[in-house]
Amino acid sequence: MSPITPVPAAAARPVPAGPAMPETRPVESVQSAPGGAPSRSRTMRALVKHHAGPGLRLDAARPVPVPGPRDVLIRVRLAGICGTDRHIWEWDQWAASRIPVGIVTGHEFVGVVEEVGSAVRRVTPGQRVSAEGHITAWNDYNSRTGNAHIARDTMILGVDRDGCFAEYVVVPEENVWPLHPGIPDHVAAVLDPLGNAVHTVMAAGVSARSVLITGTGIIGLMAVTVARAAGAAQVLATDLDPRRRALALELGADEVFDPAGPGWIEQVRARTRGDGADVLLEMSGSSAAIDQGFSALRMGGTAALLGIPSRPITFDLNNHVIFKGATVLGINGRRMFETWYQMESLLLSGRLRLDPIVTHRVAMSDFARGFELMISGEGIKVVMEVS
């Protein structure tokens, strides 16, 4: 992995008023889930953003978080490494301006409920669960009108508060998602990015329509199999990496294109009555890919944008949106909790193919190798075995 020049940390940003942060003081050992499990230690292993620069550190004596009355303490089994974690690892401009030094990172996981607060009623110790990583107090306008995924007071697990790259994590009861026994652990550990793909595909209404996916990273690849399962008439995809293009074909894409090559937009039009794709799912955040994707979108088409550019971009609004009459959707996170029900239904239907995407499992002690696999492109989705 090539060295990365650290970006100076920005001034501390204000923390939005929202859900209370769990305490992390040492606690007396308590009994784990029923069944004779051993008592829990007062400390745990956790991956911490230990300084304002590249990398993470394994802290072997982090205090176990203490659940509040409406919180759930979860023992983490597997945790997924995602693009946000890579930003934090590399300490790019976004991470330096957003991530508090000392935080436990990570937000994708599967685990078992260890302990619940006194006011928790919906989950019990011993349940296998995942969780929605966007946490809100459910008080603002968006939360109260069905759009909690874009609430003003949202705090993100592993970004604004301690996350799941640890033996234990605390989340509010409302965010806990009990898992169907038909969903295996390695899939349950990556429901967060799968939810991004499902939200994007479902928002765009792909059934019986031609779909172009620009960028087949982890979520773009998931979008290929989700779009196919959701009834897309044709799925086309682009990526610079030939390995990812090949995997997109394996997951159900009808054709893939190298966006650096000539003539591929004309090929998309040739496959779509000469008009262009009905739907664009932009997953890359690349300025060039965004421009090309809108060029390949038909007049009156729908574009759903999930990819996040690393900096502001120049965009031909006149020709790509106004004169084209395009519908443009900004996609953020997962709809809480409509997307989770859709994910569960799709997974249990057997129509999603995710096993080829989850390529590596590493021990948490070998976390540096996990990040290297992801950054090099050798790994697609890497999950860590935490406990």
Regions found by a protein language model. Give the residues of each.
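C-terminal capping/lid region of NAD(P)-dependent oxidoreductase domains
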Residues: 2-3, 7, 18, 22-44, ...
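Mid-domain Rossmann-like dinucleotide-binding core that forms the NAD(H)/NADP(H) cofactor-binding site
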Residues: 181-262, 266
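C-terminal substrate-binding/catalytic core of Rossmann-like NAD(P)-dependent dehydrogenases/reductases
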Residues: 311-360, 368-369
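Residues located in well-ordered beta-strands
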Residues: 45, 75, 110-112, 234, ...
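Glycine-rich beta-strand-centered segment in the early N-terminal region that forms part
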Residues: 64-79, 93-141, 180-182
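NAD(P)H dinucleotide-binding glycine-rich loop of Rossmann-like/cofactor-binding domains
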Residues: 98, 135-214
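Glycine-rich cofactor phosphate-binding loops and adjacent beta1-alpha1 units
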Residues: 204-207, 250-327, 368
